């Protein structure tokens, strides 16, 4: 019996080591993953914080009507939609994390741009740049989080990542309206959003990503920017 125990012990030990190695390899909660979750939450929190108060800001400071307010605010969404088809191509062609951080930095700085926008025209320009950077940083964040998580837990990891946006969406507008109703100035609100993105940018810069060789450049074609097979899924989501 004792000899049998000695004979099977190495096998059990090897199985235990192998099981531990697999668990470590498939580990989802890592410092990098936590940093990217925080970066995404803080980015969306700054975004949603201003969504309900921007109409009041445009109305009070620029004396704009409701239709003009709608057009100005929609410039952001239109700009984000226009850049998204090219975002994937850029992220595959160039280094992903630097491009992600660059887009995050531009997105962050536009909150400061709102503070110095002395005319409606300048505000619209900042709004368009803000939308372009938002389209880039959101796609870049999705790419980075996929790169740093184990493929076996990709669905779970993306679910938690998307939850950060939902959480920010649930508390950001409420927080913004609460501050506005409490008499907080618009400049202070912009600073809060700016500060949120500063913290998010710091978290994003701490994420360590594996090296991904750039995709070989191919001739420019429509399928590089629009995946026709994905059109039905996109229409159903719309």
Report the location of each language-model feature.
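Residue-level signature of mid-helix packing/kink "hotspots" within the transmembrane helices
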Residues: 77-85, 169-170
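Structural signature of the two symmetry-related core transmembrane helices
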Residues: 98-112
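Cytoplasmic helix-loop-helix junction between adjacent transmembrane helices
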Residues: 128-164
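Symmetry-related core transmembrane helices of the 12-TM Major Facilitator Superfamily/SLC fold
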Residues: 189-204
């Amino acid at each position: 019996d004792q000899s049998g125990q000695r004979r099977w012990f190495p096998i059990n030990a090897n199985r235990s080591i192998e099981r531990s190695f697999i668990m470590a390899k498939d580990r989802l909660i890592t410092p990098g993953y936590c940093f990217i979750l925080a970066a995404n939450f803080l980015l969306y929190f700054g975004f949603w914080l201003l969504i309900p108060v921007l109409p009041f800001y445009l109305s009070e400071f620029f004396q704009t009507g409701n239709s003009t307010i709608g057009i100005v605010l929609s410039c952001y969404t239109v700009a984000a939609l226009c850049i998204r088809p090219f975002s994937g191509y850029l992220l595959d062609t160039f280094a992903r994390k630097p491009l992600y951080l660059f887009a995050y930095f531009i997105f962050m700085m536009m909150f400061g741009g709102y503070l110095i926008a002395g005319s409606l025209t300048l505000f619209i320009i900042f709004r368009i740049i803000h939308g372009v950077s938002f389209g880039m940083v959101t796609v870049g964040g999705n790419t980075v989080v996929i790169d740093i998580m184990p493929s076996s837990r990709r669905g779970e990891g993306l679910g938690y990542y998307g939850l950060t946006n939902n959480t920010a969406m649930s508390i950001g507008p409420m927080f913004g309206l609460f501050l506005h109703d409490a008499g907080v100035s618009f400049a202070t609100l912009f600073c809060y959003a700016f500060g949120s993105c500063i913290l998010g940018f710091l978290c994003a810069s701490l994420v360590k990503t594996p090296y991904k060789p750039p995709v070989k450049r191919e001739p420019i074609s429509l399928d590089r920017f629009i995946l026709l097979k994905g059109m039905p899924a996109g229409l159903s989501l719309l």
